[in-house]
Amino acid sequence: MKQTLALIVLSIVSTGLFSCRHSRQIAGTSFPVTDTTQHNIISKTDSASVAASNAYNKELLSKLRSNYISFNTFSAKLKIDFETESKQMSGINANMRMQKDSFIWISVSAPIIGEVARAIITPDSLKAIDKFHKIAYLRDLRYAQDVLNIPFDFKTLQDLIIGNPVYLTDSVYQVVKTPAVISFTCDSTIFTSLFNVFADDYILQQSKVMDKDSTRGRSVELTYGEYKSLDKIKFATRRRVFVEEKSYTKINMDFNKIDFDQPVSFPFTIPSGYSRE
C-alpha cells in the first residue's frame, strides 16, 4: 500500500475549459525522430553552422519556455487508471489543489468505497493517510524519493502537475525538425532528457527522462494530449505516464474542472486511532 499510494500521489502530481485544441490526442513519437532522411537535422560542422545551431537552440528554448504556466493557485479533478505488473486499478477519482511553492494537496477516492487516501506535500514534508487501513504516514519529502527511486524536489512536482517540462536544461543538442514535431535532447547532472514539442506552437507532446547510469535501466516517459485553453493557458488535460525500472508502472490521467488562481483550502488532519508510520 505504501508504494502504491506514493506512486499514485506522484502520478497525480506527475502531469482551461473553453476552447479545445482539436485533434491532439495522446500519441507516442520516437525520440528523436528515427527516420531522418526527409527531415532537417541541425548539425555542427563548422563555425557558421555552430553559430546558427546555437541561435536556433536558444530560440527553441525561449519559445518553449514562453508556454510555461505561471500561477498562484491551482485545482482540478481527475480520473486515473493505474497499472503495474502485479495490479491494475481503473476509475480512481482524485482531487488536487496547489498553492505555488507552498502546498500540494491530493485526495484519492475509489468507486463505491469513497475517499481512501489523502496527502499534503510541502517543500520538505509528505503527510498521507490511508483511510482504508487507518494508517498515517509522516515523512520527509526525501522518503518519497527513496520509495520511488526518482530524485525530485517540490518545484519538479509543481511542474509535473501543471504540465511544464521537467529536467529541461540549456544543454540542447541532437535537434531534429519535422513539419509537425521538433525533437531534441538535453542533459542534467543525473538524467538525459528527450523532448518532442509541436512545431507550430512549441507546446509539449512528449518527454522522456532517462538515468545516465545505464545499469539502472530506469526511465520516465510523459505524454501530453487534449490541450485546452483557459485565459491563454494551454493545459494538457490528458496525460500518460510510463515509469520503468526492472518493472513498470503505467498511469493514465484525465483532468477536468480545472481552475487557476481561485481560493483553495488544504484540509488535513490525522483521525484519532490511526497508527503512524
Language model: regions and residue ranges:
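An acidic-aromatic
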Residues: 103-155
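A sequence/structural signal for flexible, mid-protein segments enriched
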Residues: 135-137, 141-183, 187-190, 195-196
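N-terminal leader/targeting segments and the immediate start of mature chains
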Residues: 21-79, 85-89, 275-277
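C-terminal motif of bacterial Sec signal peptides marking the signal peptidase cleavage site
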Residues: 16-19
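Positively charged n-region of N-terminal signal peptides that target proteins for export
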Residues: 1-6
